[in-house]
Amino acid sequence: GYVKEGEDPLKVAAEQLKRDNVDILHTIGGDDTNTMAAQLSNYLKDNNYELTVVGLPKTGDHDVYPLVQTLGAWTAAEQGAIFFENIVNENTTSTRQLIIHEVMGRNCGYLTAQTALEYNNRVKNKVFLPELLIDDDKWGIDAIYIPEIDFDFQLEAKRLKKIMDKKDGVNIFLSEGAGVEAIIREMESNGEEIPRDAFGHVKLDEINPGQWFAKRFSKALNAEKTLVQKSGYFARSAKSNDRDLQLIKNSAQLAVKYALDQESGLVGMDMDENGELLLIDFNRIKGEKPFDHKEKWFVDILRSIGQSY
């Protein structure tokens, strides 16, 4: 409602900032938030209005160049693990149950992978009672699907069918961005319109990758019950853990310093400067940073569950 049809959003925002006599703008968000802030700053400069913009990179997706770590990513992984730690107990309620844990991550599998690592570390501390059918196998992760790794559905279905037959259940960690291209192709072939947001991103909550995969895997695995649970809001609404709080504190203190010195940029851990926390030129900020799926710890997880990598 702030920008009427035909108006330039940058001009509308700039004029409002000028009317309010704002000369320092702190932006907190992901790549879209901070690249738009940079455009706003440049627009105002071109129109003889000095605005200092200092951004903080808050996104659980952890998909921003050139950052080593984004604010909230550690917490999101920890909370996603806690979420699944509760949800997975549903495996006791029926036979041949398929549980899909859908994790945030449009173009980046970092959060799904890190959440899986956190979950595995937590489940190691649990006590199981196989004689009461409370076996650690049924609490284990059987597949992890992320945007960075393509996979053959038929081969995976065959592998998971064997697991379902053996342990009476299958647990999948699915990045919300995994397989999106396949879903889009199917929708377009059916003449369906692809819903997109203001930034041109596909609205993942509307095309619902979790349900799409659930429908196909459920049939292929002869699942008697299928449960799809998204940890996104649970993780996003959680209070920051200690690691994130310390990074937030350090980042905010630097952000205030740079703002008072009238220096614009994004405060973050620069991967090109050995992870040092400093002011990064907005022009270097880009989204869609992929997860390095060749990281040893992640390869070890996939190898342990028999999934191709």
Short names for language-model regions:
Residues 1-23, 32, 60, 71-73, ...:
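Glycine-rich oxoanion-binding loops at beta->alpha junctions
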Residues 64-77, 239-245:
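Short beta-strand elements at the ligand-binding edges of bilobed clamshell
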Residues 179-309:
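C-terminal non-catalytic interaction/assembly regions of soluble proteins
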Residues 16, 27-29, 35-50, 70-224:
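Accessory alpha-helical/coil subdomains and C-terminal extensions
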Residues 10, 14, 77, 81, ...:
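Short, amphipathic alpha-helical "lid/cap" segments that border enzyme active or binding sites
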Residues 56-69, 93-96:
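Acidic/polar active-site rim loop that often engages polyanionic ligands
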Residues 30-31, 56-62, 149-150, 176-179, ...:
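Short, ordered loop/turn segments at secondary-structure junctions
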